[in-house]
Amino acid sequence: MNRLGTLSRVIARLAILCTLIAVIGCAVDQQIQTLRPGVLTVAVTSGAPTNQYDPQLWIRQYVEQFAAEYELTISWVVVPFNESWLLASRDEVDLVATNVANFPDRAHSGATFSAPFLYERRALRINPEDQERYEHISDFIGKTVGVVSGMAAERDVNRRAPDGVIVRTTDTFAQLYAEFDVGQLDAIAEAEYYALDGQVIPSHGSEVILIDHHDLTPGQREESVFVVCDKSQNLLSAVNAFIARTRFPL
């Protein structure tokens, strides 16, 4: 009986040891392996956003929280928005965090879209004093509407604007806002932002008026994602797990 009892204890201990080895092995296998070990290289469109209404600030804070949880150092790379989603597929960055919508024509081999972390609806920004003059894009015939090159807003305006609407294209929102502030633009095509639960994310104060709210594709959410480099092992699953447990914005 003593020998049987001893043998049973040995077998039980071996089983526990094997389980621990398997768990440790899985943990090692699931470690994030970035393009540069320990460094998360992230593409953004703004170097140091400070405005509480700036989506790039929300995204930056979100990525910083992710990196802190996984003990990664961040290397920020400031890029133009247009075609920024290609950087991950070219192995230039681990993560594209430029607020990319998951349009099929932005998907490329070598990178994968994350789960969505917010969604948007299209709108037009106007001056408060013009609120009685404008309601819909068709009211801007003979007027100038600004868009950022490559963004969903550009697609939307090009599709919806009737003949006679002047479309001004720039590379950045900063340039658009500067022109808007000095009266060179009558409206800016941009977005209203929403958390996944449908709550509006405040993106402007009372001095800003957004009109003509609509879905880019009627009845379909325009979802924003991160673009993750496929060579950055286990990064996609970690990002998706983080999105699942962490509400955006923080």
What residue ranges belong to the model's regions?
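A ligand-binding cleft/hinge motif common to bilobed small-molecule-binding domains
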Residues: 86, 99-108, 156-159, 186-220
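Extracytoplasmic small-molecule ligand-binding "clamshell" domains
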Residues: 30-100, 107, 167-170
